[in-house]
């Protein structure tokens, strides 16, 4: 009798591997279930309450919400009453929907006042600065030029003690900055100063040194000696020691306390060390009749309603301090509607030159009807890494131009659309 054999299917997967696969499938299923449940739970919560993630970023007073981050901000003119009687201000009506960035028509037949128009501009708070007119910005009591009896001249800035010596074998000038007394308070919180001194030998300006910073004192004792080699004794009479006294500021640019100028023509260190004490005086910013010239080009595209401003170059800019260490100019361009600033841009800094070439262009969206009320201000500024920047001069083109050349340039731009018009303009005092 034949033998019957039962053939059963065999599997190569071991029990351990099968267990791992099963566990993995179980973990995936549980994860998917938890994810779906979480999404459904969040959707249900959003329908019943305000989302908790709404936030506000403060960028100089502007609130930006998530739902409006993608909106564009444009300066757009709704209408200008040409046929009707003009308001006393003589300015057009400017309305902008801050939520959508689109036009909103003025339903008031009289139109909003210029002030209300500017309040609706979706622009930064500091853009609301007023345009300072050279004729009206300063009253006689607010003149920038300090009169002899002004309080600024009466402020005592302290004194500086130092010594001058000459090393004949090494042909070296030796200057020791010893101490200062009676410095003014530069930090209201600590009622003190963090003084240090920068020293420069004029007029070549090749030798520049500075002391360490002494914290919270009005009577610093530096006692630091600096040796300048390669200075023949015969040239000492032509040199001037310039001491600039500053107060260190951790969070902003250092404050200038004052300066001391010492011509070596009246000092004879041939017989030994000469000790001197000089009063610290207010920093002497050079006043000059000419502020230099600036060349700019303007062109207006009426179809695109865009104004292209090109800052080309400047020439004959003055040195802004007596040391002649300045000469890092850049140009800041401000656009005003009426007297409210609505846009600002600036060029790059040009290092160590009084005749800079910029060749930088800026584009502004300006409706045609707004041109009579638009002014463009150019501020030529001298960049200073240590102290505050100083305005070299100013030029205004447009509605508030105070010069004949500025008014003529603006008129040509408005009457010759699509044509770039470049002109030189003399800078005025800011």
UniProtKB/Swiss-Prot annotation:
One of its GO terms (biological process) is response to wounding. Residues 79-120, 132-152 are annotated as: Disordered. Ubiquitinated, at least by PRKN, and targeted to the proteasome complex for degradation. Ubiquitination is inhibited by ATP13A2. Disulfide bonds: none annotated. It is found in: Cytoplasmic vesicle membrane; Perikaryon; Golgi apparatus, trans-Golgi network membrane; Recycling endosome membrane. The second C2 domain/C2B is required for the inhibitory role in both clathrin-mediated and bulk endocytosis. The transmembrane domain and the first C2 domain/C2A are critical for the inhibitory role in clathrin-mediated endocytosis or bulk endocytosis, respectively. Residues 156-278, 290-425 form the C2 domain. Residues 79-90 have a biased composition (Basic and acidic residues). This is Synaptotagmin-11. Residues 134-150 have a biased composition (Polar residues). It is a single-pass membrane protein. Synaptotagmin family member involved in vesicular and membrane trafficking which does not bind Ca(2+). Inhibits clathrin-mediated and bulk endocytosis, functions to ensure precision in vesicle retrieval. Plays an important role in dopamine transmission by regulating endocytosis and the vesicle-recycling process. Essential component of a neuronal vesicular trafficking pathway that differs from the synaptic vesicle trafficking pathway but is crucial for development and synaptic plasticity. GO terms for cellular component: axon; clathrin-coated vesicle membrane; cytoplasm; dendrite; dopaminergic synapse; early phagosome; lysosomal membrane; lysosome. It holds the Pfam family C2. Belongs to the synaptotagmin family. Expressed in cerebellun, cerebellar cortex, hippocampus, olfactory bulb and spinal cord (at protein level). Expressed by neurons, astrocytes and microglia (at protein level). Expressed in macrophages (at protein level). The chain crosses the membrane at residues 16-36. Its cofactor is Ca(2+). Residues 37-430 are cytoplasmic. GO terms for molecular function: beta-tubulin binding; identical protein binding; metal ion binding; SNARE binding; translation initiation factor binding; ubiquitin protein ligase binding.
């Amino acid at each position: 009798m034949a033998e019957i054999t039962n053939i059963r299917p065999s599997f190569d997967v071991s029990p351990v591997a099968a267990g791992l696969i099963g566990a993995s499938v179980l973990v995936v299923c549980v994860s998917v279930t938890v994810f779906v449940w979480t999404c459904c739970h969040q959707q249900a919560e959003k329908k019943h309450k305000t989302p908790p993630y709404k936030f506000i970023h403060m960028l100089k007073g502007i609130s930006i919400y998530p739902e409006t981050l993608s909106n564009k901000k444009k300066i757009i003119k709704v209408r200008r009453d040409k046929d009707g009687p003009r308001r006393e201000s003589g300015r057009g009506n400017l309305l902008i929907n801050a939520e959508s960035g689109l036009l909103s028509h003025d339903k008031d037949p009289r139109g909003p006042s210029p002030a209300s128009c500017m309040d609706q501009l979706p622009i930064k708070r500091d853009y609301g600065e007023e345009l300072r007119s050279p004729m009206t910005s300063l009253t006689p009591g607010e003149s920038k030029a300090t009169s002899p009896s002004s309080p600024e001249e009466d402020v005592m800035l302290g004194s500086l003690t130092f010594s001058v010596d000459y090393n004949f074998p090494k042909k070296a000038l030796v200057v020791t900055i010893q101490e200062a007394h009676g410095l003014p308070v530069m930090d209201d919180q600590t009622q003190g100063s963090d003084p240090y001194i920068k020293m420069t030998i004029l007029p070549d300006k090749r030798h520049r040194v500075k002391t360490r910073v002494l914290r919270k004192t009005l009577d610093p004792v530096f006692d630091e000696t600096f040796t300048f080699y390669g200075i023949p004794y015969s040239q000492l009479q032509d040199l001037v020691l310039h001491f600039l006294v500053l107060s260190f500021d951790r969070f902003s640019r250092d404050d200038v306390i004052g300066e001391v100028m010492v011509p070596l023509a009246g000092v004879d260190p041939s017989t030994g060390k000469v000790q001197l004490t000089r009063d610290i005086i207010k920093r002497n910013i050079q006043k000059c009749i000419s502020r230099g010239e600036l060349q700019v080009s303007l062109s207006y595209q009426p179809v695109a309603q865009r104004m292209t401003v090109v800052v080309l170059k400047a020439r004959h800019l003055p040195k802004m301090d007596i040391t002649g260490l300045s000469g890092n100019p850049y140009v800041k361009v401000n656009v005003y509607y009426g007297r409210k600033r609505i846009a600002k841009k600036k060029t790059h800094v040009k290092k160590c030159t009084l005749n800079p070439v910029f060749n930088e262009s800026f584009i502004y969206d300006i409706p045609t009807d707004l041109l009579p009320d638009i002014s463009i201000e150019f501020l030529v500024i001298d960049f200073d890494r240590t102290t505050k920047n100083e305005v070299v001069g100013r030029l205004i083109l447009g509605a508030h131009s105070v010069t004949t050349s500025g008014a003529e340039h603006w008129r040509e731009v408005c009457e010759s659309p699509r044509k770039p018009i470049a002109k030189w303009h003399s800078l005025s005092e800011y």
